[in-house]
Regions:
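Mid-domain alpha/beta scaffold segments of enzyme catalytic cores
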Residues: 1-260
Length: 260
């Protein structure tokens, strides 16, 4: 049994065959999925999916690459929305993305801090997107954690070892995607080996980043199996044991998510 802790089932890529995609996930041993918000205004679409499929849960938040679209969304509004539905089990994804020069860093930081406050108040995990922003992300995580702890996930981890270490030291989870399986990702596998077993999660980030076995294809939740296999190899344990560990970690992290 596995949990795909991060996918985007509301994206147009899946619209025509969502039933089949979720059926394939179940057939491959992926029991539950969390479909992640990239814009707060799309929450109704995510909830429609989560309400239709018992095994699908969702989050609420604004992706950093959309930060300027939703600067009016306050922490209070995020809290209100997060507490409005049983299927909303996380805040985000929010964070910092300096790879694409499309959003002002200050707008991204403002949004991130609001999402942190919402995670702190709701006790729901904040799904953090961090790309080419290791130093600023680590500094904000430390500063905000010094104020008061909050649960978080470093999603689709592809950063450096220092950010992984900071995340673990602050009590966060580190989630690995299909990037872990790429031949050129030995550095990410080396970092994954340093993350304690009780802090590991697996995800697809579908429809993006299909694992090596399906490279070049549209990603989907069933493919998280390949990522879990590689993560098991990295830690020198069986696939079955890694599946058990990451599933229990997912339920501990997403404490509002029920078992179905």
């Amino acid at each position: 049994m596995l949990i795909d802790t991060h996918c985007h089932l509301d994206f147009p890529d899946f619209e025509a065959e969502r039933d089949d995609i979720i059926a394939r996930a179940h057939a491959s041993g992926v029991a539950q999925m969390v479909t992640i918000s990239t814009r707060v205004r799309r929450l109704p679409e995510l909830l429609k999916i989560a309400e239709k499929y018992p095994s699908v849960f969702c989050s609420v938040g604004t992706h950093p690459n959309n930060a300027d679209e939703e600067l009016d969304i306050s922490a209070d509004e995020l809290v209100r929305l997060a507490e409005s539905h049983d299927k909303i089990v996380a805040i985000g994804e929010a964070g910092l993305d300096y790879f694409y020069d499309t959003q002002k860093p200050e707008d991204q930081k403002t949004g991130l801090v609001r999402h942190i406050e919402a995670a702190r108040r709701t006790k729901l995990p904040l799904v953090i997107h961090s790309r080419s922003a290791d130093e600023d992300m680590a500094a904000i995580l430390r500063e905000e954690s010094d104020k008061s702890a909050f649960p978080f996930i470093l999603h689709c981890f592809s950063a450096g070892p220092d950010l992984a270490k900071t995340g673990v030291e602050l009590g966060g989870y580190v989630s690995f995607s299909g990037i872990l399986t790429f031949p050129k990702s030995q550095d990410i596998r080396d970092i994954a080996a340093t993350v304690p077993l009780n802090r590991l999660l697996v995800e697809t980030d579908a429809p993006y980043l299909a694992p090596k076995r399906w490279r070049g294809k549209r990603n989907e939740p069933s493919y998280v199996v390949n990522t879990a296999e590689v993560l098991a190899e990295v830690h020198g344990i069986s696939f079955e044991r890694m599946a058990e560990i990451t599933t229990e970690n997912a339920f501990r992290c997403f404490s509002k998510m029920t078992r179905v």
